[in-house]
Amino acid sequence: IKEAILSILPLCDEVIVAVGDCTDGTRELVQAIHPTKIKIIDTVWNTALNRDGIVLADETNKALQAAFATNSHWLIYIQGDEVLHEDGFAAITQAMEKHKDDKKVDGLLLNYRHFYGSYDYIATSSHWYKNEIRIIKNNVNIYSYKDAQGFRKGDNEKLNVKPVDAFVHHYGWVKKPKTMMNKRKEGVKFWEGEKYTEEYDKTDLGDYDFSQIDSLELYKKPHPQVMQQRIINVNWKFNYDVSFNKKTLKDQLKNLLFKLTGKRLFEYQNYKII
């Protein structure tokens, strides 16, 4: 979470962080990131919403409500396992200025890289979303949607967005195999509820098997500056032979169409590009 917050800090006047009721030092870690820019919203997670990831959107909306009360034109959203790459800062600030007063534009659409197993590989099959909204107008009619992957406005209406040449790095699948399995076990309750989690916890599932993946490619570009120390401290290995990728016929067709047209055809879009 530290790197996530640091990655957006240069673009923000204030960063509002929703911190749940915990005793693991998270609140102290967040508060220490910046002496004046950090504002913490203390929350209690509603376990009655532990189904289909709804509780994640509920927590997001708590922070959004605090952000709506500010006089900012734009709100940047980042999740704890995401990092905004500084290479996109100029494009983001230009887009913010250009579309600030355009009432048709609800938000800005960013590109995604999903890292998997280690910081050396990104997932490339079609079920990993290629884009998502991470910057929205300060509009109280906008809210976090379903499992907090994206946003809606009004009566379940998709947001109108402008694409921006900037990348969010998603590192949620880069952990020690044992830590990854523990995360998966803990995360089950947000979709299946506490009762299911109790049964799940009785079983020692060992280490997470990262080899069960259909398609990866090597990442050879720089990571965000805020990630450098974390990457240096890596103490596990994950090696994958990209020649063994098992892309489905569906994915092969989508990739071919993308090369020919430059558009991601037949993929679900949680937004409207205008």
Annotate each PLM feature:
Residues G53-N61, E86-I274:
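Catalytic-site signature of metal-activated, phosphate-bearing donor transferases
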Residues G25, W74, I78-A95:
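Acidic donor-binding/catalytic loop of UDP-sugar-dependent glycosyltransferases
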Residues L9, F68-A69, E97-D101:
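Residue-level signal for alpha-helix termini/capping positions
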Residues D13, H73, D81, D106, ...:
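Conserved acidic residues
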Residues G25-Y77:
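Active-site-proximal specificity loops/subdomain of glycosyltransferases
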Residues V19-G25:
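Acidic ATP/Mg2+-coordinating residue in the GHKL
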Residues I1-I16:
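Short, well-formed alpha-helical segments that are part of the catalytic scaffolds
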